[in-house]
């Protein structure tokens, strides 16, 4: 046990010298340590050589312990080994441990204690200090003075600290005494205040009691005075009653009693009559109340029906206005075609006159085969009669009229074979609506008659027009495959100018027109969201494929129509662009009641618009009786990186997906400026809307356009007959 304690103390001493904590002392470290302890370099080298037993130029803990034990065995007798180890021999006669080092301490240590005088009491762990003193005295006596100097410094600091502690204790005691004095003063002051309050309350209570007592005295005096007055009156009445004759009084009283009895009976009769009339009036009032309640309910139902009729009337009026605009445009186009027809007839007549005057005209008149058709513009008398009937029908029927006008187009309308590029915006107009038209031109058979007449084969020329229902007032035109016209006598090739799709055949176009004209349902889609999130730009990109950076804020509600092919079927969408400003929220909320779907937009570069999405969804749920499909659209995705680099807080895609999953809504990020994911978002929402409406029994929110479509030919007929 003693060896373990000795090793632990030696290890602690070694670690104090080992500043690098490497477990060994280099020669440089040992020299620096000896220089701090004021040991000469020669003595330091001698001590290092004695401690470095394995001659590896470093002192390990084992070398240090071995050298320390060897030095102790040379200089100390064996009887004092316990003193070196710091464990004095235990003796039952000396139980006090503090007296053991004094008995076994060296004379040098005792002399040092005498020199310290009273400061010895401030040395902590005096036993360990004495052991270290003896060890240093044995190993290196020159270090004793430095060790004594260190101990004196420690004793001085400990003494100062003890003095400071005493001063602090005195200060704390003074503070406690002062606090106690202040507390006693506060208690005295509180007692004084309480006494003053008690005195004031007692005075007030005494004053109030005196006032109450005075009031009671006054009341008592007034009552006594009233009693005295009544007593006097009673005495006077008693004196008067003694003087009145009793018989006369009895007769008068009987008459008065009889009169009062009759009056009482009459009043009772009147009371019964009044109660009866009140009961009748009450029953009539209840009947009137029930009638009023029934009438109010019926009036509310009528008002709801009227509101529904009003909405339908507004929709129909809007559609009629669109059709009227389309009719006016058709009328203008008919005028243009009529003028073109007149010009073509003039050219046709001139060409006939030229042919009649040519030498080949004799063959044309004499040959029965040539009377059928010798040129694209020659017609037989029979065909002329048919053409006259056809033209007369065209005057009444706008569809036939358009066919006739196209059949008689002049040669200037025939292309030379060079393609002409047209902007798609040339055919797009916000208020333009055109019915489906299919132009057919009959094929004229031609035969070859030797070399007298030129052989010109005129194949069938069909001008077709791809039609789609009103897409927000925009009509999409697609150029069709041009049909070539060849001639055996000439190598020229000409193409018919057409505004139809280049990748759609005639049969496909007819099928598409048939499908589009039978799309009777229009689904109401409402665009919602905060102001300046890009709803109007989204709608403009969807309907017109345009983007304008200087669009103004929407006031109230804007309306557009768009037709999309969803799962192979044409779907007409009514797109309602609502204002996102706070003052128009009530208007936007009213449009949610009959909506089939909602496009809820927010700005990915504006965190506030994303946080307000929950309020918009709550508004939609409050306004609708059933759950409707919602497509959450994060717009302006193209600006997110730029705004994030500028330090703005942007909404990431993960946040939008989590929020959409929370509410069971669809989600998509778009860019109205770049046009990305615009059509995809609307297609997904339209698909969900169609699924929901197909599964519902109540289809009140779907507008039936069959009546409006059936009226289009009649309206166009009336328009053309003007």
From Swiss-Prot:
Disulfide bonds: none
A GO MF label: GTPase activity
GO CC annotation: perinuclear region of cytoplasm
Sequence ranges of Low complexity compositional bias: 480-491
One Pfam entry name: EF-hand_7
PANTHER family hit by this protein: RAS-RELATED PROTEIN RAB
Name this protein carries in UniProt: Ras and EF-hand domain-containing protein
Organism listed in the record: Xenopus tropicalis (Western clawed frog)
This protein's encoding gene: rasef
């Amino acid at each position: 046990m003693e060896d373990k304690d000795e090793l632990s103390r030696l290890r602690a001493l070694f670690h104090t010298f080992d500043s690098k904590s490497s477990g060994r002392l280099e020669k440089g470290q040992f020299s620096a340590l000896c220089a701090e302890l004021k040991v000469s370099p020669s003595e330091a080298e001698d001590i290092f050589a004695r401690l470095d037993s394995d001659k590896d130029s470093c002192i390990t803990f084992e070398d240090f312990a071995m050298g320390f034990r060897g030095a102790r065995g040379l200089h100390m007798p064996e009887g004092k080994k316990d003193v070196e180890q710091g464990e004095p021999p235990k003796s039952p006669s000396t139980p006090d441990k503090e007296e053991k080092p004094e008995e076994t301490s060296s004379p040098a240590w005792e002399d040092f204690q005498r020199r310290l005088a009273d400061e010895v009491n401030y040395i902590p762990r005096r036993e360990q200090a004495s052991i270290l003193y003896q060890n240093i005295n044995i190993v290196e006596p020159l270090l004793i003075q430095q060790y004594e100097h260190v101990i004196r410094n420690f004793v001085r600091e400990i003494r100062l600290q003890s003095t400071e502690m005493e001063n602090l204790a005195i200060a704390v005691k003074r503070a406690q005494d002062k606090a106690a004095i202040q507390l006693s003063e506060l208690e005295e002051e509180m007692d004084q205040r309480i006494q003053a309050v008690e005195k004031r309350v007692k005075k007030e209570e005494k004053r109030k009691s005196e006032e109450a007592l005075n009031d009671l005295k006054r009341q008592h005096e007034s009552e006594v005075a009233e009693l005295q007055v009544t007593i006097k009156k009673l005495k006077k009445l008693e004196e008067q009653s003694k003087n009145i004759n009793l018989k006369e009084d009895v007769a008068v009283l009987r008459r008065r009693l009889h009169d009062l009895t009759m009056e009482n009976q009459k009043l009772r009769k009147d009371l019964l009559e009044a109660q009866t009339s009140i009961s009748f009036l009450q029953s009539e009032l209840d009947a009137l109340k029930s009638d009023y309640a029934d009438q109010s309910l019926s009036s509310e139902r009528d008002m709801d029906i009227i509101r529904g009729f009003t909405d339908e009337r507004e929709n129909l009026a809007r559609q009629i206005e669109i059709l009227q605009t389309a009719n006016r445009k058709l009328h203008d186009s008919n005028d243009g075609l009529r003028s073109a027809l007149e010009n073509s007839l003039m050219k046709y007549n001139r060409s006939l006159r030229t042919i009649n005057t040519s030498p080949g005209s004799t063959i044309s008149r004499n040959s029965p085969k040539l009377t059928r058709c010798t040129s694209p513009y020659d017609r037989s008398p029979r065909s002329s009669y048919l053409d006259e009937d056809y033209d007369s029908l065209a005057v009444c029927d706008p569809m036939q009229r358009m066919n006739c006008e196209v059949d008689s187009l002049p040669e200037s309308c025939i292309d030379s074979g060079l393609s002409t590029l047209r902007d798609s915006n040339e055919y797009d107009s916000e208020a333009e609506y055109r019915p489906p038209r299919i132009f057919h031109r009959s094929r004229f058979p031609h035969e070859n008659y030797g070399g007298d007449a030129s052989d010109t084969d005129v194949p069938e020329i069909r001008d077709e027009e791809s039609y789609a229902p009103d897409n927000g007032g925009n009509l999409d035109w697609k150029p069709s495959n041009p049909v070539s016209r060849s001639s055996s006598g000439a190598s020229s090739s000409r193409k018919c100018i057409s505004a139809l799709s280049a990748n759609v055949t005639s049969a496909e176009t007819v099928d598409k027109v048939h499908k589009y004209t039978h799309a009777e349902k229009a689904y109401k889609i409402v665009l919602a969201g905060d102001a300046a999130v890009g709803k109007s730009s989204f709608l403009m990109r969807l309907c017109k494929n345009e983007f304008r950076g200087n669009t103004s804020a929407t006031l109230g509600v804007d309306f557009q129509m768009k037709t999309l092919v969803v799962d192979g079927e044409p779907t007409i969408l009514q797109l309602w662009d609502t204002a996102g400003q706070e003052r128009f929220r009530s208007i936007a909320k009213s449009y949610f009641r009959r909506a089939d779907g909602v496009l809820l937009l927010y700005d990915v570069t504006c965190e506030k618009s994303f946080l307000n999405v929950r309020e918009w969804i709550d508004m939609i749920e409050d306004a609708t009786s059933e759950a409707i499909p919602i497509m959450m659209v994060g717009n302006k995705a193209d600006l997110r990186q730029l705004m994030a680099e500028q330090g703005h807080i942007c909404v990431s895609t993960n946040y939008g997906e989590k929020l959409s999953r929370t509410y069971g809504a669809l989600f998509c990020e778009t860019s109205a400026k770049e046009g990305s994911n615009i059509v995809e978002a609307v297609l997904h929402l339209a698909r969900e809307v169609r699924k929901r409406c197909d599964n519902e029994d109540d289809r009140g929110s779907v507008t039936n356009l069959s009546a409006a479509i059936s009226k289009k030919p009649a309206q166009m007929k009336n328009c053309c007959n003007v």
